[in-house]
A protein has these predicted regions:
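Short glycine-aspartate micro-motif
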Residues: 2-8, 60-64, 129-134, 140, ...
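Short glycine-rich, Thr/Ser-proximal phosphate-binding strand/loop in the N-terminal lobe
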Residues: 2-43, 51, 58, 77-80, ...
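A mobile "lid/hinge" subdomain adjacent to the ATP/sugar-phosphate binding pocket shared
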Residues: 14, 24, 181-255
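Glycine-rich phosphate-binding/hydrolytic loop that grips phosphoryl groups
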Residues: 19, 108-119, 261-317
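Glycine-rich phosphate-binding loop and adjoining helix at the ATP-binding site
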Residues: 34, 38-43, 50, 58-63, ...
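Phosphate/pyrophosphate-binding loops at sites that engage ATP/ADP/AMP, CoA/4′-phosphopantetheine
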Residues: 45-63, 104-105, 123, 199-205, ...
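Glycine-rich phosphate-binding loop of actin/hexokinase-like ATP-binding domains
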Residues: 125-184
């Protein structure tokens, strides 16, 4: 069977999927292993792809990789100075893919890939003015305007909503900024933000082996004072970031993804209420919906890009 191969290089796990006609035939995950170089990780990644193809007797028609950083999707280059893998900018990922499989290759930022996946196969269907925000290891964003992906001269446009400063007196972010949405309310910042609170030693959170958003929301529901405070701060940070995206890009719909959306019944009403209070246009109705493709939006987005190669690739992205 001929399939497109989608690879989503997330902050914690790398996901590999075989896609046929917009359907995932098979998928697997491997650890992101940020303590290795990208060149080392790519070899292990390729072995994982080949094993999945062999197991399901499939032949690749193209390889699409979603990468967690700023990328030049036209020249297929990694542009970020700060990326998960220190050698990433030195890797010619297009040549590596061609040498390994000899098939067409698509390359995109992971948030943009997720937006494309939701636009074509999930919560963004039938909507050409769309904002996606993913709440996970970091905070990723992407923007679609009139059916075209927003990129800008340096491929930054719409992609750095997680690095908008919302607290001038906040924590330092790993990007070098202060009080970014990401440093205020992302998974990588959560443990540090919680443990430095003077309320930590008397909070139930101090007994948790791992402090994550599931534990914060669980203890908040039980009335823990610190958990309630952290939950409110994070929801306000996420919503402030979303409002910044709305006033900047005027979307019809906002899609929120990431593992934290297990608590969507709490988060979505909170976000909607704050947006309504801060709307510039009377009766402006902006849809706020949870992502539908929580696991594989990036893989589906990359498989969609593969179908455009040689067709209307430029008109969409």
């Amino acid at each position: 069977m001929d399939v497109g191969v989608g690879i989503d290089m997330g902050g914690t796990r790398i996901k590999i999927g075989l896609v046929k006609d917009g359907q995932i035939i098979a998928a697997t995950k491997i650890p992101a292993s940020a303590d290795t170089t990208l060149s080392q990780r790519l070899n292990e990644l390729a072995d994982g792809v080949d094993m999945l193809l062999k197991e399901h007797r499939c032949t690749p028609t193209g390889i699409g990789i979603a990468f967690p950083g700023i990328v030049n999707s036209d020249e297929k280059k990694i542009l970020s100075k700060y990326v998960k893998y220190p050698d990433a900018q030195k890797i010619n990922i297009s040549s590596w893919t061609m040498e390994r499989w000899g098939v067409p290759f698509a390359f995109e930022n992971d948030a943009r890939a997720a937006l494309l996946g939701e636009w074509q196969y999930g919560a963004g269907r039938i909507c050409d003015n769309l904002v996606l925000i993913t709440l996970g290891t970091g905070v990723g964003t992407a923007v679609l305007i009139n059916g075209k992906m927003l990129k800008g001269k340096n491929y930054l446009a719409g992609n750095l909503g997680g690095h908008v400063s919302i607290n001038l007196h906040g924590a330092e972010c790993n990007c070098g900024g202060t009080g970014c949405v990401e440093s205020e309310a992302s998974t990588w910042a959560l443990q540090k933000n919680v443990t430095r609170s003077p309320k930590f030693n008397t909070s139930a959170l101090c007994r948790e082996e791992e402090i994550n958003f599931n534990s914060v929301f669980m203890w908040a529901a039980k009335g823990d004072e610190l958990a309630l405070e952290v939950k409110e701060n994070c929801q306000r940070a996420w919503t402030t970031g979303i409002i910044n995206l709305i006033v900047s890009y005027d979307p019809e719909r906002v899609v929120i993804g990431g593992g934290i959306m297990n608590s969507k019944d709490i988060i979505i009403p909170y976000v909607k209420d704050m947006i309504k209070k801060n709307s510039w246009i009377k009766d402006n109705h902006i849809e706020v919906v949870p992502a539908e493709q929580l696991e594989y939006a990036g893989i589906l987005g990359m498989s969609y890009l593969l179908t455009l190669i040689g067709k209307e690739y430029k008109s969409v992205i």
